[in-house]
Amino acid sequence: ASDVYKRQVDASSVNAPDVPETGVTFAENSLLKARAVAEATGLVAIADDSGLSVDVLNGAPGIFSARWAGSHGDDTANLNLLLAQLSDISSEHRGAKFCCAASVASPNGFEAVEYGELPGELLTAPAGEGGFGYDPILRPVELNGENALYEGQYAGKSCAEIPAEIKNSISHRARAFEALIPQIAAALAS
């Protein structure tokens, strides 16, 4: 595995194309990006697409998470719009999860996608300064309750209030890429 890290290159360093996210799922968008970079560079490529899925919104904002309020990447506007949309929703109906589809594609056509999720509950107001996006309003379920990870040390905390190394260890991206490792090895061997 350490050899893989020695050989990694950033997409921008090989003039990889900027790929429009035209898919209708996280998996489709992730594969579009990995496939385009693999085809353009002749290298094995990995990519991901991720976002927030809110139960009472039937999975929205989903693939539109980064542009929920209209402008791509306006985290504050996205977060404020979502909170306004959920303002009359009681705490027992504020279930949500961060979702990630991570993919690998090789120039010879090998493709694979793996998924990761971080289930949680949405707070009614932002809490914390860390992270980005919707981190200030998602409280991870597994850090709360009887079987809480880290002995309940982070109970009640949003993703923006917990240390980055803790958040990263339980994140949807970490889980998706951990699941993708065998597929990356297979792509490199293909």
Locate predicted features.
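Short, small-residue-biased leader/transition segments that mark boundaries at the very start
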Residues: 1-5
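Anionic-ligand binding patches
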Residues: 6-190
